[in-house]
């Protein structure tokens, strides 16, 4: 949980830096921005699962509910999505709502994390929020009733899927994070295209894109391709990475992993070894084989992402 403590601390410092001051009387009831509606509903859903698990004495599941919400939904996505709107250059009309919702979620998250991690949460509650009452004796939050907006859920989940796919392409093809890319989108589904248009600035900022273009023709030769729902996306790689070198690198990695898998399979098919080796050793070998298979699949996916049509 050391990394989780750091995550909580960094989230708090980010809000402090961006002047997200907590108002104890604030309640996120009438929200305009879909990102805020999404995170509040995610928090409501987490509270429901948390209380169900606590009432059933499933403390491990309860801790997992909090961990996944705060790390994934709040830090990895919500904070990332609102960063461009909180920057000094931002002219977003939703900046006040972002500040209120982000601090409201953080404070109430500290309350439910407190029984599992009392020291860091009490410290932040006192130093950042100025709380005079200890979290351990304060009332736990209740779901904040707002419109359960499926439009918000569908919009943000699609946005997250698109950003994730772009991240995967960068990672698998070793494209430097700061390297500006062009995103091409090929699809006639107006709903998804309207979402992309709506969040274009956020997508470009988070994914380090120079532009987003809608096309009706095939992707250019040497484009990394992916699928997000019904959308086909492409990222032209010409001038970004050396395609020939990248193909050679990926094929070498695949051959290396295939040799590892072969060795693992030979040992696991050896009945003499299986009968004599401790169960722990056999299981570790199986885990290593499975990890190598997963790695091979990812390398093949990376190789297949590059479109080499002549």
Locate predicted features.
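C-terminal low-complexity, glycine/proline- and small-hydrophobic-enriched intrinsically disordered tails
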Residues: 127-310
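Short amphipathic alpha-helical coiled-coil/interface segments
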Residues: 5, 43, 47, 66-71, ...
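Acidic, turn-prone loop/beta-hairpin segments
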Residues: 22-51, 79-164
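A structural signal for well-ordered alpha-helices, especially hydrophobic packing surfaces
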Residues: 12, 47, 51-54, 78, ...
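Non-cofactor substrate-recognition interfaces
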Residues: 14-36, 224-233, 245, 275
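Structured ligand/cofactor/substrate-binding pocket environments in proteins
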Residues: 1-15, 64-68, 99-122, 194
